[in-house]
Amino acid sequence: MNLKPIGDRLVLKKQEKEEEKTFSGIVLPSSAKEAPVYAEVLAIGSEVEEDEKMKGNIKVGDKVIYSKYAGTEIKLEDTDYILVKYEDILAVVE
């Protein structure tokens, strides 16, 4: 199943982080971690592709940092996705 974002939205796939440990070696459970802010762009809405100000800034496959509380989380076929607006993308990781 494919997600096709509408307007100025993007479909992102959250990037898994490695297991985190404290300085003393205690493994932090995922519930103790902050919400992920790194993701890979899987699809881009038509408005982002056509608007002169947005066009070319973000491409499918880019790794991005997005606003922590932005977007709508969706789970399809055991995969977690997040739909965010273009304005919620803070940076492209190069």
UniProtKB/Swiss-Prot annotation:
GO cellular component terms, semicolon-separated: cytoplasm
Keyword Chaperone recorded: yes
UniProt record, GO biological process: chaperone cofactor-dependent protein refolding
Alphabetized InterPro entries for the sequence: Chaperonin_GroES, Chaperonin_GroES_sf, GroES-like_sf
Keyword set, alphabetical order: Chaperone, Cytoplasm, Stress response
Pfam families for the chain: Cpn10
Compartments where found: Cytoplasm
SUPFAM superfamilies per UniProt: GroES-like
UniProt main location, coarse: cytoplasm
Domain of life (superkingdom): Bacteria
Gene Ontology molecular functions: ATP binding; metal ion binding; protein folding chaperone; protein-folding chaperone binding; unfolded protein binding
Keyword DNA damage among UniProt keywords: no
PANTHER family, sorted: 10 KDA HEAT SHOCK PROTEIN, 20 KDA CHAPERONIN, CHLOROPLASTIC
Quaternary structure and interacting proteins, as annotated: Heptamer of 7 subunits arranged in a ring. Interacts with the chaperonin GroEL.
Function: Together with the chaperonin GroEL, plays an essential role in assisting protein folding. The GroEL-GroES system forms a nano-cage that allows encapsulation of the non-native substrate proteins and provides a physical environment optimized to promote and accelerate protein folding. GroES binds to the apical surface of the GroEL ring, thereby capping the opening of the GroEL channel.
Family: Belongs to the GroES chaperonin family.
Entry protein name: Co-chaperonin GroES
